[in-house]
């Protein structure tokens, strides 16, 4: 079944896999999900991701990151901000800080998908996709 919100689907799959302490999770591969996975990897929230499958049925296998003996998830929470029914945009001066800089906001800008920190540094605003902490 086709999903209307691939970003929300990706965040939910990561959240559910984290709660169940799964080592990996699989999400449909799109340009947007690849970019978000790359940002999560660069920020240290996930170990790695790779594409599997062929042709139309491409998936991303995301390797989740845990810490300590109790395997506490590195990602405490994921929150979808801009949704298909209500888009949320922010200019460069109003980019949100997540938990005073502890978390990140993932922003879709004209320069690509990046964190709020990178967008502030580049002086661009855009659509606030989600918060991760």
Curated annotation (Swiss-Prot):
Offer one example of a GO biological process linked to this entry: translation
What the entry lists under InterPro entries is as follows: Ribosomal_uS8 (IPR000630), Ribosomal_uS8_CS (IPR047863), Ribosomal_uS8_sf (IPR035987)
Q: What UniProt keywords are attached to this protein's entry? A: Ribonucleoprotein, Ribosomal protein, RNA-binding, rRNA-binding
What are the protein's GO molecular function terms? Answer: rRNA binding; structural constituent of ribosome
Answer whether the UniProt record assigns the keyword rRNA-binding to this protein.
yes
Q: Where is the signal peptide?
A: none
> Which Gene Ontology terms of cellular component type are present?
ribonucleoprotein complex; ribosome
Specify one Pfam family. Ribosomal_S8
Task: Please tell me whether the keyword rRNA-binding is annotated for this protein.
Answer: yes
Task: Extract the coiled-coil ranges from the record.
Answer: none
Q: How does it assemble?
A: Part of the 30S ribosomal subunit. Contacts proteins S5 and S12.
NCBIfam families assigned to the protein according to its UniProt record, in alphabetical order: PRK00136.1
Q: Which family does it belong to?
A: Belongs to the universal ribosomal protein uS8 family.
HAMAP family per UniProt? Ribosomal_uS8_B
Q: What does this protein do?
A: One of the primary rRNA binding proteins, it binds directly to 16S rRNA central domain where it helps coordinate assembly of the platform of the 30S subunit.
| Identification of the protein by name | Small ribosomal subunit protein uS8
Q: Which organism is it from?
A: Cyanothece sp. (strain PCC 7425 / ATCC 29141)
């Amino acid at each position: 079944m086709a999903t209307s919100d691939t970003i929300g689907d990706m965040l939910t799959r990561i959240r559910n896999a984290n709660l169940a302490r799964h080592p990996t999770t699989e999400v449909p591969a799109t340009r947007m999900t690849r970019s978000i996975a790359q940002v999560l990897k660069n920020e240290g929230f996930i170990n790695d991701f790779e594409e599997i499958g062929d042709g139309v049925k491409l998936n991303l296998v995301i390797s989740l990151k845990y810490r300590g003996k109790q395997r506490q998830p590195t990602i405490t929470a994921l929150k979808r901000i801009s949704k298909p029914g209500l888009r949320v945009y922010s200019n460069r001066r109003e980019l949100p800080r997540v938990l005073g800089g502890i978390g990140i906001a993932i922003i879709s800008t004209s320069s690509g998908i990046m964190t709020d920190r990178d967008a502030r540094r580049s002086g661009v605003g855009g659509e606030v996709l989600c918060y991760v902490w």
